[in-house]
């Protein structure tokens, strides 16, 4: 590949870790395992993600697989759908769940229904990774938990891990799934 590994990969030793580090490990391991996996979203590259979940990935995998986007949640979702339909396995990061609402047209009318609209002959293997809930002093537009809303959409899979161990395992499972998963 045209990039060189500058950052150290996460440790694979059995250790106590944080939820955030578990997410970082899951993304890193799947990008290492499968060249079709890539990360796309606001500030995921140079900045390392809003909370640091993608720190080091840009240096390790390059700009072709760690893609910084403008502030356009609908664009992130649309790019993920298009890439998924061509055989890629995108992980789209939407920084706060509040802004999943901006991408609902793509997620509800396209990603969730592709398998059914094409009689099972098409798949949309993508993950939308986001953060939900209060506690970070995010204010009215950065603290909602809209999980219940997205669970009501037929065809979307929704995963809400409660601990670091489950977060890593379920993220890996979500990336390998052949349907759209909201994580």
Predicted features along the sequence, with ranges:
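Thiamine diphosphate
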Residues: 5-182
């Amino acid at each position: 590949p045209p990039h060189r590994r500058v950052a150290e990969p996460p440790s694979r030793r059995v250790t106590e870790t944080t939820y955030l580090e578990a997410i970082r490990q899951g993304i890193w391991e799947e990008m290492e395992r499968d060249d079709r996996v890539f990360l796309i979203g606001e500030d995921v590259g140079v900045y390392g993600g809003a909370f640091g979940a993608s720190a080091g990935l840009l240096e390790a995998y390059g700009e072709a697989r760690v893609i910084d986007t403008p502030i356009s949640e609908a664009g992130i979702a649309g790019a993920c759908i298009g890439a998924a339909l061509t055989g890629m396995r995108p992980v789209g990061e939407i920084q706060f769940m509040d802004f999943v609402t901006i991408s609902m047209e793509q997620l509800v009318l396209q990603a969730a229904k592709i398998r059914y609209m094409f009689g099972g002959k098409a798949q949309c293997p993508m993950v939308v990774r986001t953060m939900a809930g209060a506690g970070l002093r995010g204010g009215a537009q950065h603290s909602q938990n809209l999980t219940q809303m997205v669970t009501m959409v037929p065809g979307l899979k929704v995963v809400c891990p409660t601990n670091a161990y489950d977060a890593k395992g379920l993220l890996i499972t979500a990336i390998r799934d052949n349907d759209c998963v909201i994580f």
